A protein has these predicted regions:
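Short beta-alpha junctions and helix-cap segments that line functional grooves
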Residues: 59-60, 132, 242-244
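Proteins enriched for Cys/Gly/acidic motifs involved in redox and nucleic-acid/cofactor modification
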Residues: 1-16, 73, 96-106, 130, ...
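Short acidic/polar active-site loop segments enriched in Thr and Asp
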Residues: 4, 43, 142, 147, ...
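Hydrophobic, well-ordered secondary-structure elements that form the walls
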Residues: 75, 116, 136, 144, ...
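Conserved SAM/AdoMet-binding glycine-rich loop
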Residues: 3-129, 137-138
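Short, glycine-/Ser/Thr-/acidic-enriched flexible segments
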Residues: 13, 52, 119-120, 151, ...
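Terminal RNA-binding accessory module
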Residues: 160-292
Length: 292
């Protein structure tokens, strides 16, 4: 039907098929999806909500080897303190999660990792929070979200929260959330600036025309579009603003050079717009003068 992108979403995509007796598992599903996309020509499949539990080497090798599986994983870790991981009944401890994160980066070149954490879970101490904060600064996730724990009736956590000694005050939750997001902001903004400084080239999937922000070249406003590189999932991650001299269409894949950054977002120009027609040998290229 002309779709270019497929986002796999579920409560736990890592363990896909186990509840319905499908022996293919996630590896088999990814392989079949990759082959289907290949038969249709182009596109990418993005893995979301992949729990770290049971994420084994075969899955890592499969993602690394398949051309149409985006080198992007959304893997909710929830915390990095053993105390909290045990209370949350996550089934893994910090060392296991940490080893998996570094193994993913080592064995899948160019992999973008997104994760989510919960702050203020009943019983979370300041030491638990500091362990998480330190890991966020150390590992430097490509994308990250933080959620404040909220009460859900009928859950074990809700029972824990009934104990005043375990309940985390709302103002403490807010402070911890802010500290985590500021740490991630520093990482994300630096990454965006680096890609702009290097003039990195990516294929950008165009989503829609951008009407709120404009990019100018020599004081002339260029038509601007919202798009995403492979490392940007829809709705939850940053975007790439593409300023083009030519009209672009949603669903179009455009090779672009990153020429600027606006906090989390990237600013790009189509490579074809930046090329100069000349019969002389030229080394390097020009990115034009762009501002947002």
């Amino acid at each position: 039907d002309g779709a270019f992108e497929l986002n796999m979403i579920g409560q736990d995509t890592t363990n896909w098929g186990r509840d319905i007796g499908d022996d293919r598992g996630l590896v088999g599903l990814l392989t079949e999806l990759n082959n289907t996309v290949a038969r249709h020509g182009s596109g990418w499949v993005r893995l979301m909500y992949a729990y770290p539990t049971n994420f084994d080497d075969e899955m890592i090798d499969t993602i690394a080897s398949l051309d149409h599986i985006a080198k992007y994983i959304d893997i909710p870790l929830q915390h990095m303190s053993d105390n909290m991981l045990t209370a949350m009944r996550r089934g893994l401890l910090r060392k296991e999660q940490e080893d998996l994160m570094y193994r993913l980066r080592e064995r899948i070149p160019g992999l973008a990792i997104r994760t989510t954490f919960i702050t203020g879970f009943p019983g979370e101490t300041e030491d638990d929070h500091q362990q998480l904060l330190e890991f966020v600064r150390e590992f430097q996730f490509d994308m990250m979200g933080v959620f404040k724990y909220s009460h859900e009736d009928g859950t074990v956590a809700a029972t824990m929260e009934d104990d005043p000694k375990l309940r985390v005050p709302e103002e403490v939750k807010e402070r911890r959330e802010e500290e985590l997001m500021l740490a991630q902001q520093e990482v994300a903004w630096a990454n965006a600036d680096y890609l702009a400084e290097e003039g990195a080239v990516f294929d950008v999937l165009i989503d829609e025309r951008e009407h709120q922000r404009e990019v100018t070249e020599e004081d002339v406003a260029l038509p601007t579009y919202q798009g995403r590189c492979y490392h940007q999932a829809p709705e939850v991650d940053s975007i790439t603003l593409v300023a083009s001299k030519h009209e672009l269409a949603p669903g179009e894949l455009v090779r672009c050079r990153i020429v600027g950054a606006a906090e989390y977002d990237l600013i790009a120009r189509p490579v074809s717009d930046l090329e100069r027609s000349t019969s002389l040998p030229v080394l390097g290229g020009s990115s034009g003068g762009c501002s947002a």
